[in-house]
Amino acid sequence: MKVRSHLNNKQGLYDPANEHDACGVGLIVNVHGGKSHGIVESALKVLENMRHRGAEGADNKTGDGAGILLQIPHEFILLQGIPVPEKGKYGTGLVFFPKDEKQHSAILSIMIEEIEKEGLTLMHLRKVPVNTDILGKDARDTEPDIKQVFITGCDDQQVLELKLYIIRKRIEKRMAASDIPNRKDFYVASLSTKSIIYKGMLESMQLRHYFPDLTNPYLTSGLALVHSRFSTNTFPTWSLAQPFRLLAHNGEINTIRGNRGWMEARESVLSSPRIPNIDEIRPIIQPDMSDSASLDNVLEFFVASGMSLPHAMAMLVPESFNEKNPISEDLKAFYEYHSILMEPWDGPAALLFSDGRYAGGMLDRNGLRPARYLITKNGMMVVASEVGVMDFEPDEIEEKGRLQPGKILLVDTEEGKIYYDGELKKQLAGAQFYRVWLANNRVELDELKSGRHVPHTVAGYDRMLRTFGYSREDIERIIAPMCIGSTEPVGSMGNDIPLAVLSEHPQLLFNYFRQQFAQVTNPPIDPLREDLVMSLTEYIGAVGSNILIPNEAHCKMVRLAHPILTNTQLDILCNIRYKGFKSVKLPMLFEVSQGCEGLKTALDRLCMQAEQSVACLLYTSPSP
């Protein structure tokens, strides 16, 4: 097996953190939970009918990725001669190992050690039959050794499911820190008591042929989630094929850099009764994976912490609401509360998800990726990124339609019930007294008044302009026309200004931020054309509080209608003494004569002062 030195390693302008893709997704589920091989076969046909959604190499044999998520086929496993206990009392999943025997053994030792730490046993290791002959050159060169693990030792399914999650995260953490040469070839595709995933660096037509298990008539499931990957600006790899552990995703998360950064920042204050030592499973988001994988990591963590699957999805991918798109007051309060806790994972996205019991789909709040659904009279539901993925006679169809922006459609296979968005969101909105919490704790900046006289001039105006990097052109050509005409000034000849980081002159803070790639949409989107899904609302307060435990203390925030403040509003914030709020001024000055060392000392002092005053609203000032 060749070493993947050319894949997934940061080099030149390529960074694996920028992984995005655009794909085909499909879900087929028996609403009443009935299992059959027919569902697996139908799902594979859905995948094959979306072949045009995936990408292939020049050899027409190397795909960007294809996969299927199924319920664990208990009877099929018994027929393989594996003496597993009854359903729900064992965990299983596919694991990708390097083909080097020494590395394989070293990784297996780590796995066994972590499994036994939780009081469990690695009961069996099955070599998954595969058909390597159908692979293209690139896929064959990087093909892992695929094994199916079976873990026993706990009779409580919920407890075992959580233990399996913790074990996998610990193994991933140890592998990332290990010196095993091909450790990046190791990947746990799934490890669960409820679902199993078959996937790889395949194209849609290859999946059933590469994994003979999938064509065995005794392999049954009550639901199936399929995915055909098209990498828009990334390398195909075995580990980045979808579905992931809970979801399959068509689209992009354009806010991914901020989402990852904020999630990493709040890890230190997270705590959950279900996961006593969260430090052991950090980082929650596995490094060097795609945007879809990062979203799946966070979704999986929330569900493992006790949050319901629809609650977690509604929190991560909220729908829009305003005067043009009214929703109930209770649901509005639900979203306002959660907007304080978690920034939206935003971007064009069709999301299908399942944990083995629940299965459903939703769209992003813009609705920029399509998804259609169909329900038959005999209790089958199909959701896919396009119509026509399965053939039905017209008299078989009970209902069909398209998923709406920000709306969820969910099936509970144990209850045998379809939950539409309205019923789901009503349950979520009524779970806590969100409106009361907000009313008692949240402060609206626009409603605060001050008797202080605040001048609308700035002392040392010219000096302050130079200090903050404003040029005459910024004032005369950009800011003044915006203030006078309420429109953004239009210029020609493009922007040929060098990067701010290379300039010898002071630069505006904003000049250091650029688009990472061509973040465009068709049609164009801006706050004027799309005010239905745009918001300038900002919150100031204790952003890093523990988001896993519902608490009205999270609502102790100051709400800003927009981030641009008047002098009066800024003065109110700097002198706030209302509902327990208070503020502290932190000077951001240093002795220029001391050069770089003076700047470093001043920054260290600023950080220390911020830590000491963290219970207050902090604001920096260019004055002592």
Regions found by a protein language model. Give the residues of each.
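Secondary-structure boundary elements
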Residues: 250, 615-616
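Conserved small/polar residues in nucleotide/adenosyl-binding loops
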Residues: 619-623
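Conserved short alpha-helical segments that host acidic/polar catalytic motifs at enzyme active sites
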Residues: 2-553, 566, 574-577
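Active-site cores of enzymes that catalyze phosphoryl transfer or operate on phosphate-rich substrates
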Residues: 519, 532-605, 609-614
